[in-house]
Regions:
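C-terminal catalytic domains of large/alpha subunits in multi-subunit enzymes
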Residues: 1-128
């Protein structure tokens, strides 16, 4: 369970704060799903064991905490009116930050996603 999510973003001149905030929140939610839950599982012959959403674990709204978002006060000479692209940049730092938090908690840094509770338990036991 993720208890708190705080994200800093450099979007240059933020022309539409609500839209930019939504972009960051969506990217963080997607990244939490990728870091903790989502995994394509294969059988021994290479067949997909998780072909439908009933068997493929994705985060629910209850799995995603509110995200505090702080925008850096910068400007970009190349962007329109000083804006920078946000696209999916919020996605990139989430898994490494979570891996560092897990290392701080149990002394071992996971190097594989998803960082499921089973994998974390094995890491903590020295099994992984």
């Amino acid at each position: 369970i993720v208890l708190q999510s705080v994200h800093a973003a450099d979007a240059g001149t933020v022309m539409n704060p609500q839209q930019c905030l939504g972009q960051v929140e969506g990217g963080v939610a997607q990244a939490i799903g990728s870091a903790l839950y989502e995994e394509i599982m294969l059988d021994g012959a290479g067949g997909v064991l998780t072909p439908v959403f009933r068997t493929y674990r994705m985060p629910q709204m209850a799995d995603i905490p509110d995200t505090e978002v702080y925008f850096a006060d910068t400007s970009d000479d190349l962007g329109p009116y000083g804006a920078k692209s946000m696209s999916e940049s919020p996605f990139n730092p989430v898994a490494p930050a979570m891996a560092n938090a897990i290392r701080r908690a149990i002394g071992v840094r996971p190097c594989e996603t998803p960082m499921s509770r089973d994998r974390i338990w094995r890491l903590a036991q020295g099994i992984a």
